[in-house]
Amino acid sequence: MFASPVTSTPFSVKDILNLEQHQSGLSPMDITSRLENSSCMLSTFKQESYPGTPCLSELTEEMSQRDTAKGPSSFPGSFFVKNYLEMDSKDPKDHKKDICPLQKTLEHDKREAEDPERPRQRKRRKPRVLFSQAQVYELERRFKQQKYLSAPERDHLANVLKLTSTQVKIWFQNRRYKCKRQRQDQTLEMVGLPPPRRIAVPVLVRDGKPCLGESSPYNSPYNVSINPYSYNTYPAYSNYSNPACSGSYNCSYSSMPSMQPTSAGNNFMNFSVGDLNTVQTPIQQASSVSALHHGIRAW
C-alpha cells in the first residue's frame, strides 16, 4: 500500500513549532523592514532627556563595542539607533503645526475666563459715507424726476457721480422714507386735532388728611341749600278768639246748645254745625276764599 500524503493542520503542535522555527530563520533584512514599518507610530513621540541618563551617542558606542566583542551579528548597529535618530531629527516647528484647532479655542476661552473685566473689542463699523454738495444736488434732482431707479439707471448714475451702486440705492431708500414721513406730518397738521381737554380734579386728601371738611376754594355749581319747609306762610287758626274755634273737636246739632271752650290753647277744636255762619264771618274779614282752602288743608 502507498503511504498517504501528510496533511498539515494549522493547529497541531508540529505546525506551531515549525512556525517558531520559521520566524527564527528569517533574514535580518526582513525583520528590519517590518520594524521600520512599525516605527512610524513611535516616531510621533519625542524622546525627552532626563538628568543622570546617558546620552544617545554613549548608548550607540556601548552597543557597537558589544557587537565587536561578541563577534559579527546578524543585525547592524545602525539598526538600533535609526529610530532614535529619526525621532530626534523631527523639527519642533512641524510639531507645533499639528496642534488641534480645538486646543486653540480652549486657550482663547481660558484667557477670557481669566480676564472677565477686560472689555471685548467691538467690531469697527464702516465709516459713514459723506456726499458732496454736487452729489446731493444731482441725487435730489434725479429723485424729483424719478423716485424709483432700475438697476441700469442706478449703475449709470453711480458712474456719473463716482459712487457705488449700493450707495445710490441706499440713498434713494432713505429719501423715500423721509418723503413718506413728511406726508404723514402734513396730514396730521391738516386734520387739526383739538388739544386734549383739561379737567379740574378736586383734591380729596392732602398731606394724609382729608380735605372734605375744609372750605373748598371753588364754588360748586351744585351747591343747593335745602331748608326745612316752613308753615308760616299761612295764618294759624289757633289764634282766633271765637268760641267756635277752640281746641277740642265736638260735633253738635243746632238744637243743642254749643259747649263753651275749655281753654284757648288746646290742640283740639270745638266745631258746631249751627255756628258755621259765625266761623265764616272772621274768615271773610281776614282774607279771601283761597286763604280758607289753604287753612282747611293745613288743618
Curated annotation (Swiss-Prot):
One of its GO terms (molecular function) is DNA-binding transcription factor activity, RNA polymerase II-specific. It holds the Pfam family Homeodomain. InterPro entries: HD (IPR001356), HD_metazoa (IPR020479), Homeobox_CS (IPR017970), Homeobox_NK-like (IPR050394), Homeodomain-like_sf (IPR009057). SMART domains: HOX. It is found in: Nucleus. The homeobox domain binds to double-stranded DNA. This is Homeobox protein Nkx-2.5. It comes from Xenopus laevis. The gene is nkx-2.5.
